[in-house]
Amino acid sequence: MNGDYDRKFPQARALYAYMAAHPGKKLNFMGNEIAHFREWDEKREQDWNLLDFPKHREFAAYMQALNHLYLSEEALWNDYSGNGFEWVHAVSQNYPDTEHSCVFAWKRRSENGRQLLCVFQFADRADCVTLPLSEDEKPELVFDTDWTEFGGAAPKQDEVLTAQNGRAVTKMAAFSAKFFVVGKRDEAETEADEIKPEQKADTEVTADELITAEPIEKLSENSSVKLVDGAWFDRAVVYHIYPLGYCGAPQYNEGEKTQGSRILKVLDRIGHLKALGVNTIYFGPVFESLWHGYDTSDYYRTDSRLGSM
């Protein structure tokens, strides 16, 4: 693996997850399960002393959990039919052009119809990955290579992807993979996510009633509005602008000097925002820098309840 000691482990976890999810039978040499540094050698035993180090113990626990997942999910090993594999068009926020994208996704299916959505992110920084998803699908996270129990940074917790206009977004750590079991949403869940027509009857926006846009710095000047991981306060919302329309942002052209008011003109679902009671959208003044690889994810948040713009 490339990089220093700490960076090798997430890469190895992502690689073995890719191997487990890829069609075909698996072969691992002894020693791989403890992140051996040297080649397997039939003339000497493994360097079991590596398990004295936390990183290697965590990696051994990871390999054990991955093997258990492989055995328990028939879709991963019952691969005798071409119907058991389907590519999924995953889009990277950091590299929206497919030539430089480091994200991949596919579905594995078992003969009994159970589906596993496998998402991979092989770049060296966190990314926001957009996936196509039908409204009745309910992918639930069952495995994340970045969980802390494996030596990663993400606490083990539930994650359920929700479709907005046929797309869903998941945040991926650098060199990571996620596996989701794809179930079906029941009618009650679907109805709860929908906005009733009568609720938005009086919320259409006219040309003279554009939602205001302000620099995000004003958040600190307004005591009635507070940003906490994208939560809403006083009917205001922070909306993260990404290039090329991915992750639910409006589209704009590279090189264009974009102002908040001009962004608002291309929003095609203003009425949807008004129906949710949103009167103000705060835009960060970072449009041009996004084109030069500046990662603003630590400073701006997207509230997924907005839906896709």
What does each model-found stretch correspond to?
Residues 286-309:
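Aromatic-lined substrate-binding rim segments of carbohydrate-active enzymes
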Residues 1:
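Active-site core of glycosidic bond-cleaving carbohydrate-active enzymes
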